[in-house]
Structures are given as structure tokens and as C-alpha cells.
Amino acid sequence: MDQAEYFHSWCRQDEMMLNLLEKCPTQQIQRLPLPIRRLEKKQEIQKMLEARREDYHKAMEGVAREWEKLQEKEAEIRVGLEKYKKSIVKNDKKQERAFRDAAKARSMCIQYDLQLKALQEQCEELDKKRAKTKAQVQKYEKCHRYLEKVVKASEKFQSIPELMSQFHALVSYLPQEEQEEQKSQESRSQRIHCMEEKSDSIVQFSNEIHRLYIRLEKAKKKRREWELRWNQMLKTATRKNLLLGTIKAAVRDIFQTVISQGLGSNSVGEDDIVEQLEIIRKDIEDLTDIWEKLSLNEELMEPIRAPLLPTDKTLGHPPSQ
């Protein structure tokens, strides 16, 4: 038999004993043994515990209700706190707006004060101008009466404004007349100045023409001189060309004579005068050396016939063709 079964059996015995005690009177209960009395006390304690448990449950239910109420109040407080925060933010914004409005109002007051001072100064200036105009009106009142008399006396004008408009038209026309007169004087002075400049330029051009004419005469004179020089140069060149042709013909004759005697080479061209003269010079030097040698040995050797050289008479004639 385990403990659970023992406990259940003991509980059943206790219940049976309690039922018997309820059926027995109180005098008999006092005579009951100690275990029964203990069981009775235990039952009383259980009843007290159950009563306290019920009180505890009731108290917990009340606490739960109070807790719900507290949560509702907390939610209400939170909502109120949010509203309070929003109201604080709104109040801050309103305060800032009020500060800005106050600053604007102060600046507007300052501007209005400045405008008021400016208007006061303008009023003072207008008062001064009014006093001046009043003095001028009093001053020119005689003129007004005089103009009225003039209008009455004249048949052309019907009122003072008409007379004044005519007067202003004439006054405005006078500067135009002065300007036109000034323009005409300026144009006249410009024309005179232009004529003077033209006359000066004409004199300068005439002087320049005279100077150029003198230069032209000098150039013509120089041209004639250079023409004379050119003619002289042509004559001199012609004469020198003739002399050069004569010299060339003489050189050619001498060269032909030297070639005919076999003293030079025939490979030189007919127009190469320089080579021909060089060959003639060499031949003359050779003949001179030979002649000197022969003159030294004249007594020992037979007379040698020297080659015939061209005479002065044949120098100026060209060779026979």
C-alpha cells in the first residue's frame, strides 16, 4: 500500500469521523478521544483557510478591479499628459508667435515713429512753402490786378490764362529763335572756316604743283644728260668692240702663222682667244730662248734661219679666207 492510497484512506476516515461528530451532541464530543478532537480542529482550520482563501480571492478580485481602474486612470493620465504636452507645445508656439508679433510690432512702431517724424518734417516744410507761397501771392497780387486791367483793355484776349498762355508760348519760342540764330552763326563760321581751310589747301596744292614741276624739269634735264652719257657709252662700246674684233683677228692671224709653222697644237678652238694668246706667248718665249742661245754660239754654228714672224703690217688684217 503506497502513501497516496494511505492518504486517501485516512482522508475518508476523517470524513466519516466528522460526519459522526456532527451527528453526536456537544457533550459527547468533549468526551471524544484526542485524535477526533485533533481532526475537528483540523477541520476548523481548513474552514478558516477556506474562508481566508475566499477572502483572498475576493480581495484579489477587488485588487484586479482596482488595478483595472488604475490602468484606466493611467491611460486617462497618459492621454491627459499627451494633451498637456501638446498644449505646452502649442503654448510655446503661441509664445514664439507672440514674441515675433511683439518684435514686428516694435519694428512697426519704430517705422511708424520714423514715418511720423518724416511726416512732421514734411508738414513743417509744407508750412514753410505755404508761407512762401502766401508771401508770393501777396507780392504778385498787384501783377494780377494789372493783368485783369490788361485783359479788360485788350480785345484780343478774353481771360488771364489765355494771355499767360500766349506769353509762355512767346517765351518758349525765344530760346528756339536763339538756338536757330546760334546754329546759323555756327554754320556761317564753319563755312568761313572751311573756305579758309580750302584756300590754304589750294595754296598748299599750288606750291606742291610748282615744286613737282621744278622736280620734273630737273628730272628731264637729268634724263637728257643720261641720254648723252648713254650715247657716249654706246659709241665707246662700239669703238671698243671694233678694236676687240681687230685684236681678235690679229691674234687669230698670229695663231694661224704659229700653227702653219708647226710650233703649236691645232686643238684650240677658233673663238678661244685666251688659249691662242697663251700658245703664242709660249712659242715666243721658246723662240726667244732659242735666239739667245744662237746669238751666243753665232761664230761656231751656221746661221739658222729664224721662223718668219708676222710684221706690224699684217697685225691689223684678218687672214685670207
From Swiss-Prot:
One of its GO terms (cellular component) is cytoskeleton. InterPro entries: CFAP_domain-containing, DUF4200. Pfam families: DUF4200. Keywords: Coiled coil. It comes from the Eukaryota. Residues 36-144, 202-229 form a coiled coil. Belongs to the CFAP73 family. This is Coiled-coil domain-containing protein 42-like 1. It comes from Xenopus laevis.
